[in-house]
Amino acid sequence: DRQWSRGLGDVYKRQVLTTASRETLRKQASWLRKNSKITVVLEGHADERGTREYNLALGERRANAAKDYLMTYGISSDRISVLSYGKERPVDSGSNPLAWSKNRRSVTVKAN
């Protein structure tokens, strides 16, 4: 399973890392420091509201916020790629606040 974490929650229309997200990223940074050959892809996702273009840009900002946070813990930027799916890959297909909350996320995936 290449997927490492999901659900790094974000606030609507923002790329804010929650307290729980920061803790998850700290643990990932610690693991990555011990496994220096591993690279990761940070995927940014958005809910269904907004245009495709807007949500792709928002997903990229979310993934970059996670990347910046990992870098503050000493993980080199050349080990981290960023990819935005915008609203194209929801984890919940519902059209309600709970589904939207689940779909606003960053996901860390092991690249190798």
Locate the predicted segments by residue:
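Periplasmic OmpA-like peptidoglycan-binding domain that tethers envelope proteins to the cell wall
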Residues: H45-N112
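A generic structural signal for short
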Residues: D10, L17, Y54-N55
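Periplasmic peptidoglycan-binding/anchoring modules of Gram-negative envelope and division proteins
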Residues: K13-E43, K67-T72, S77, T108-N112
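Short secondary-structure boundary/capping segments
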Residues: D1-R2, L32, P97-W100
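Single conserved hydrophobic/aromatic residue that forms the stacking wall/gate
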Residues: R2-Y12
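A residue-level signal for beta-strand positions that form part of recognition/binding surfaces
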Residues: G7, T39, R105
